[in-house]
């Protein structure tokens, strides 16, 4: 499916990009998530966002890590196929979670959200945040999967119900919003990138975009830099 791309899993590999492409290239986020859009804005690079319309159902036997990686690639690839120019750089991202080796799906409703959070009490949950960058200028696909471990507090059922009613995290992996009140459910977080749990690993992404010529600290690519 991805044979037309040269695939890299090394964040520091610099690709040879013609200088004029830096001006013509357009950055596209393959997501309709308002949270991912806000996080990407932190890098200061102009971008557009488009709906990849990807089915996020897990395949039989698929682990959380493989699910997140596949969906991140599928989202970026779907937008890449729709574009009518070879100057675009496309970002796809996805997140999946597991507890005791079992995949935690997006709860979808209040009952499932409460059941998931009750199961997480006092335990360590693994979150896998995948990010994929497809550079149509060079035909390259770069990808990373960040592993974040979250140790949950042990709270009363009434507290969990109150949280769910306040934030309604029905479409979130694990049944909480780490960018909001969900942080109050945690005892500790272990990760190499604190932004990964929020849905977009900005440390890896900034480094990768810099490696392909889209540097947040360069005036040519970031209008906010003087």
Segment roles from a protein language model:
Residues 25-45:
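N-terminal beta1-alpha1 ligand-phosphate binding loop
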Residues 25-28, 64-226:
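Anionic-ligand binding patches
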Residues 48-56:
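A short beta-strand-loop structural module common to alpha/beta enzyme folds
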